[in-house]
UniProtKB/Swiss-Prot annotation:
Topology within the bilayer: Multi-pass membrane protein
Gene3D superfamilies in alphabetical order: MFS general substrate transporter like domains
Residues where Phosphoserine is found: S204
Keywords: Glycoprotein, Membrane, Phosphoprotein, Transmembrane, Transmembrane helix
Protein name: UNC93-like protein MFSD11
Length: 449
């Protein structure tokens, strides 16, 4: 197998492994609040929003220390160990107790930080400046396929149900646990790429990331270097500007992955289909994500205009979705009680409009995330692990804040927060992209990014 084929193989395996893991985890997150609302009528008392706030809060803090972990252990073993904790969290839903539920939330927050730092590093060392855009698109499309498969099962399994029984819950979460474990094992198929033509090849700390037989002294040096780089990159102009864009992706991640499905499941006017519509919503979010990731990955080789048009498309699509959701959903839908809400929206609540908005949310999200992955891999090719750690730190802390306020804020206030951050995040991305065009003058084939 040629070096380029080996790198592409690694990217595909990386994407497929994440597809399995996040088929389980994203489906879990999409239905968690609805499942827990049903559980709250028993001896269990908890909140899916609170669990997600814990996960993303711990995730954000842990991102500060994960570059040294990935530098020492390597991305492959880091992702495998993280996958085990993801599987543990999903398994807790089979017989949840408040203490085990929230404890698992803490552990998966740590695991997520390690997982995503290792993913960014693995993506970068298997790419060069000509393939980073393509590889980002391939990975993103495979990752977001996860939204399709798990939610398709939920749609058919929960058809016509207004409450989730213990049998329904266990059937779903046993299957999701097994799927997560399959994805975890797939990380062992990733091969060490040849050292030539890898992004950041001049940086020894990136070249050797997948080496496992190094001296303890060298490991310590790599850990200290990675830790220092994380703090240095935090205060660079480009990273500060991109952090505004990243903050927006954290807010809208919370909305489409946890809040929007809960809103749909709480609207009594949708009748007996309200619970199965949660699964259908997740499917159409996934279709939007897959379409965006595939399209922008294929077009990246011939995109003479850079990343800005894709991000502009993303924010326009999201603003349309937010406006339709504002009109179509009752304001109290995110915080409705177990029995749901009978409140009226500005227009008659439509299932078709709700599902259309799901698609638009997924498409817009793929616009932002594929371009952020691409520009980070390009600008910070020699410091990939610290750069992606900062990216996930900002994204996750904003997601944690959003999950926290989702317990209290009415829908229109949540939408307003996203509109404000989306507007300024788009402007800040444009600024970095325009400055990045200066790489052309230094001989980099910028159009292929």
């Amino acid at each position: 197998m040629s070096p380029e084929s080996k790198k592409l193989f690694n990217i595909i395996i990386l994407g497929v492994a994440f597809m399995f893991m996040f088929t389980a985890f994203q489906t879990c997150g999409n239905v968690a609040q609805t499942v827990i609302r049903s559980l709250n009528s028993t001896d269990f008392h908890g909140s899916g929003y609170t669990s997600m706030a814990i996960i993303y809060g711990v995730f954000s803090a842990s991102n500060l220390i994960t570059p040294p972990v990935v530098a020492i252990v390597g991305p492959q073993l880091s992702m495998f160990a993280s996958g085990l904790f993801y599987s543990m969290y999903i398994a807790v839903f089979n017989q949840p107790f408040p203490w085990s539920f929230y404890t698992a939330s803490v552990f998966i927050g740590i695991a997520a930080a390690v997982l995503w730092t290792a993913q960014g590093n693995c993506l970068t060392i298997n790419s060069d400046e000509h393939t980073i855009g393509r590889n980002s698109g391939i990975f993103w499309a495979l990752l977001q396929s996860s939204l399709f498969f798990g939610n398709l099962y939920v749609y058919f399994a929960w058809q016509g149900k207004t409450q989730i029984s213990e049998s329904d819950r266990r059937t779903v979460f046993i299957a999701l646990t097994v799927i997560s474990l399959v994805g975890t094992v797939l990380f062992f198929l990733i091969r060490k790429p040849d050292s030539e033509n890898v992004l950041g090849e001049d940086e020894s700390s990136d070249d050797q990331d997948m080496e496992v037989n190094e001296s303890a002294q060298n490991n310590l040096t790599k850990a200290v270097d990675a830790f220092k780089k994380s703090f240095k990159l935090c205060v660079t102009k480009e990273m500060l500007l991109l952090s505004i864009t990243t903050a927006y992706t954290g807010l809208e991640l919370t909305f489409f992955s946890g809040v929007y499905g809960t809103c749909i499941g709480a609207i009594n006017k949708f009748g007996a289909e309200e619970k199965s519509l949660i699964g259908l919503s997740g499917i159409f979010i996934g279709i939007g994500e897959i379409l965006g990731g595939s399209l922008f990955g294929l077009l990246s080789k011939n995109n003479r205009f850079g990343r800005n048009p894709v991000v502009l498309l993303g924010i326009l699509v999201h603003f349309i979705a937010f406006y339709l959701i504002f009109l179509n959903m009752p304001g109290d839908a995110p915080i409705a009680p177990v029995k749901g809400t009978d409140s009226s929206a500005y227009i008659k609540s439509s299932k078709e409009v709700a599902i259309l908005c799901s698609f638009l949310l997924g498409l817009g999200d793929s616009c932002f995330n594929t371009q952020l992955l691409s520009i980070l891999g390009f600008l910070y090719s020699e410091d990939s692990a610290p750069a992606f750690a900062i990216f996930k730190f900002v994204q996750s802390i904003c997601a944690a804040v959003a999950f926290f306020y989702s317990n209290y804020l009415l829908l229109h206030w949540q939408l307003l927060v996203m509109v404000i951050f989306g507007f300024f995040g788009t402007l800040s991305f444009f600024t970095v992209e325009w400055e990045a065009a200066a790489f052309v003058a230094r001989g980099s084939d910028y159009r292929s990014i």
